[in-house]
A protein has these predicted regions:
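Mature, well-folded catalytic/scaffold domains that follow N-terminal targeting or propeptide regions
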Residues: 1-291
Length: 291
């Protein structure tokens, strides 16, 4: 596939998605980020149908003019990330935007998105999934839509509930190979695994909060048996790209695309260490998905 054409098409979808107001689980930003990564596995595999699906899905949503602007705001004279954290806890979008406007004068917008990712993980906001997609897509588009991306993240963080943070929460070492698969938690675990292994500026704090959050999941699997296919071990992540290419278009849906990309990312960071475990989880998911 033409790499530049793909980038242009997905970049346009990404920009449009920043002005879509929908539920987190079906938001097009999830699909755009996933399609970008699946196609990136091997550009020699023709995914024109997947691109068309992504474009049509994005265009199926209504757009709002804006969630807010960072121009002409009343920026406080002294501001810190602590100020932004307080305004986010209070669900005060206007004050959060004021704080961001001030922070942008002294801080890189990329750092602000990382902070928003850290915040959403620390306070267990369901928006962390979208913020993570925003982080990855901004790398893809060379941070061309930073302001819109920040506003988008703040909007979704302030409109969703968060959980109180406590240092007293039990911390559990994130032992991915011991995770007991659960329909309710596997998506969060796979996202955490990817974030855990990403080279982030705020890595130490983010890692600490992930360790706290995974304490709520079951990591007691002795993992005596794995179920893999020979072609999965042979082709690695490329198997996922080929699988979705050969899938009948009628069976494509946002959740399947999103989940396949979560497993792709896990395989990337596993680098052979946990591959059989990841393939077993994926095969279990596909078994119940297509039953």
């Amino acid at each position: 596939m033409n790499a530049q054409l793909v980038k242009n098409q997905l970049s346009e979808c990404f920009y449009k998605s920043l002005f879509v107001n929908s539920e987190i689980s079906i938001h097009p930003i999830n699909i755009i980020s996933s399609v970008k990564s699946i196609i990136g596995i091997d550009l020699d595999i023709n995914h024109s149908s997947l691109i068309d699906y992504c474009i049509n899905y994005t265009n199926s949503f209504e757009y709002v003019d804006s969630f807010g602007v960072l121009d002409n705001l009343t920026a406080p004279p002294a501001v810190s990330f602590a100020s932004l954290e307080e305004s986010l806890i209070n669900k005060d979008m206007k004050e959060s935007l004021n704080n961001v406007a001030a922070l942008l004068k002294v801080s890189d917008g990329k750092h602000i998105i990382e902070f928003l990712l850290e915040f959403s993980i620390k306070y267990r906001s369901p928006a962390f999934q979208l913020v993570w997609c925003i982080y990855k897509m901004n790398l893809f588009v060379d941070h061309k839509n930073l302001n819109e991306s920040i506003i988008f993240c703040i909007k979704y963080i302030t409109k969703n509930d968060i959980s109180p943070f406590s240092n007293a929460d039990i911390k559990k070492k994130f032992k991915f190979d011991k995770y007991v698969f659960s329909d309710k938690s596997f998506k969060d675990v796979l996202i955490y695994y990817s974030i855990y292994n990403e080279q982030l500026i705020r890595y130490s704090k983010i890692k600490e909060y992930i360790d706290i959050n995974v304490s709520f999941f079951d990591f007691s699997d002795p993992r005596k048996h794995t179920k893999t296919k020979d072609e999965q071990l042979k082709y690695g992540r490329r198997w996922i790209s080929l699988f979705i290419k050969d899938l009948d278009e009628s069976k494509l849906n946002p959740d399947l695309i999103f989940v396949l990309d979560l497993f792709r990312s896990a395989l990337k960071f596993s680098d052979g260490k946990h591959d059989k475990i990841i393939w077993t989880m994926l095969n279990n998911y596909l078994k119940y998905y297509f039953k």
